[in-house]
UniProtKB/Swiss-Prot annotation:
It comes from Erwinia tasmaniensis (strain DSM 17950 / CFBP 7177 / CIP 109463 / NCPPB 4357 / Et1/99). GO terms for biological process: division septum assembly; FtsZ-dependent cytokinesis. InterPro entries: Cell_div_ZapB (IPR009252). One of its GO terms (cellular component) is cytoplasm. It is found in: Cytoplasm. Signal peptide: none annotated. Belongs to the ZapB family. Residues 4-78 form a coiled coil. Keywords: Cell cycle, Cell division, Coiled coil, Cytoplasm, Septation. This is Cell division protein ZapB. Non-essential, abundant cell division factor that is required for proper Z-ring formation. It is recruited early to the divisome by direct interaction with FtsZ, stimulating Z-ring assembly and thereby promoting cell division earlier in the cell cycle. Its recruitment to the Z-ring requires functional FtsA or ZipA.
Length: 79
């Protein structure tokens, strides 16, 4: 009887080891995914900052062109 109990215990221990091994593999996969996602977030953040700078530059250029256009229209009205 105690041999059967020992076999059952051994089977449960082996099942626990297998479960732990699978969970460790899953943890490694999730760590890799997390690293990849962090990299993507950093890239997106960098892209966002670049777009904000470009947007500001374009707004400044638009303002300069509007001022030039107003000046030209003012000269045309004078003539």
């Amino acid at each position: 009887m105690s041999f059967e109990v020992f076999e059952k215990l051994e089977a449960k221990v082996q099942q626990a080891i297998d479960t732990i091994t699978l969970l460790q593999m899953e943890i490694e996969e999730l760590k890799e995914q997390n690293g990849s996602l962090n990299h993507q977030v950093q890239q997106a953040s960098g892209n966002s900052e670049a777009l904000v700078r470009e947007n500001q530059q374009l707004k400044e250029e638009q303002h300069v062109w509007q001022e030039r256009l107003r000046a030209l229209l003012g000269k045309m009205e004078e003539v």
